[in-house]
């Protein structure tokens, strides 16, 4: 079972009845659902004993579920009752320390005298107890690979559609955006495609396929094979996208105790707004949000590195932009573990121009409980690189990694450059001071060093002996708005020099916290820097939540913006699942001036699946905007609608999102799908809810989709009448 596979659950009510020891056991077939009463009587003898035969059972060894399959049972003349027919090889796969006698039925009790076996036919269980010294030691959350389920054959589409219509003094226009993540599961193979469509009134629509690939698991190696468009990991080299073939470790197959990361994007909308997120030239996210602070925690990165460029488009058409840095600390590997990745294909990042063939390998090994060794090699057209590093668990000091990369590059003008880059990464939580350094990193590169992406961009920007560079108009005009870049030409290329990143959180008392995210990138042949700074303070006093936030974004090509925001909210709980929250916001930014807003929002219905909000906003030009929105988490998808108006402007917006799953039982509509989801079958249970799933109910055909499940883990699904 994989993080992009579909799993199938069938529900059944099972009841076990135990009578006093001096009484023969009797079974009532009506209490054992999922078994025909006539068939039940065929395997229960007249004296109450279970008859020999083959039964579908869940196999438990020392209370750990290790397998689910048919098992043949025969009479046990030595001990009475029934004995399962399991081979020694099967017991070994279940973690029992025995030798393989190559016989179809291994006599467990003859080899391990203290072993006990019991068939619980009412609950479809084969219960085996074995002394611990005969059992391999597994982590507490271990799941046997034999239980990994490839899932059913199925097809699905996960969609998100948003549109807004605007009318104002400048005329009328409409914007539409549709994101489709689709897939087909056939046996152990999974075919996937991510694509989007968008259209702005008066312009031609645009359809783009972002990525297509096929993948399958190689469970004995705890690995995954991918064919198509994917990206290399960033544990050694910077991650790059490519089209080709990749084989590598899938760490999620390991237990949680033996084993990642996407940034949460935060901001403030002054009115009903659309938020767009771009990475590596792709529009990867577009969502309508109501006025007030927003938090995007479901971003799927196109690449494992590459900053996120966020644009907030307000109801009146004004825009603000900022950058969220995306860097991660390579995970330390446990002693004796290996992580590897082999990639081969052609560079593909969504942009036109030079795209070299490449081959890359990376390997990390847990030398002991303190040190991890890692390194790799990268070969591409006009480019070679090798790297080696050491990661260390320093105990109370924290976790630190250091690596060095040596690279040789042939530039577009034929010059051969060689240089090195050293990188340090650090992470530490100081419990005594409640300080958490989630990421602290520094990289320095010599003038002759080019990463692969730098080498590709150097050739793409080369035109008639000069390099083309982008820049934005001067930001001295405080009414500056995001616009298309302009170009100028130089005789040198701005390759990266040094970069510093830090992400930290400081807890203050019981109800307060301060956070800081900072990134700075400097370049050779340029005195400017790219800077991104986000800082904030959150606290609660007597049920009143408040926060102060600061944000600054600066490009080494002139444009910059900064903002400061004060937010106060007071929640009220009327009754269970019916909440009201009042919020007040005051903000000032270089690009938008001063603005403020006040609003009320809440939830309705028994499970809180209906949300609503009303907001009034103003700015320092006496321009006010009023807005209202409704959101609904439905059985067949999610709906959001909003309306905003001012003296000179009107905007109506709509979001529709959900999933469509086609399977052998038909077609089932659902809420938006995660990368792993489950299909539930419960006939004659129309309208019954699923436990811990807001808005998810059994449809008229007896099916429902649980949109989020955890891969390679035991997931519990239950009906909630």
Feature annotation, model-predicted:
Residues 2-6, 10, 15, 22-258, ...:
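Post-signal-peptide, soluble extracytosolic/periplasmic N-terminal scaffold domains
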Residues 72, 695-703:
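Short, acidic Ser/Thr/Gly-rich low-complexity loop/linker segments typical of extracellular
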Residues 77-86, 299-305, 703-721:
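Short Pro-Gly-centered beta-turn/loop motif in secreted/extracellular proteins
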Residues 87-93, 309-312, 627-631, 712-721:
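A short, solvent-exposed beta-strand micro-motif common in secreted/extracellular proteins
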Residues 151-169, 186-201, 225-229, 339-348, ...:
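Transmembrane beta-strand segments that form the barrel wall of outer-membrane beta-barrel proteins
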Residues 159, 180-184, 211-217, 361-365, ...:
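Residues on the lipid-exposed face of transmembrane beta-strands in outer-membrane beta-barrel proteins
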Residues 172-178, 206-210, 261, 336, ...:
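Residues that define the transmembrane beta-barrel architecture of outer-membrane proteins
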Residues 204, 229-241, 401-496, 548-567, ...:
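Outer-membrane beta-barrel translocator/channel fold
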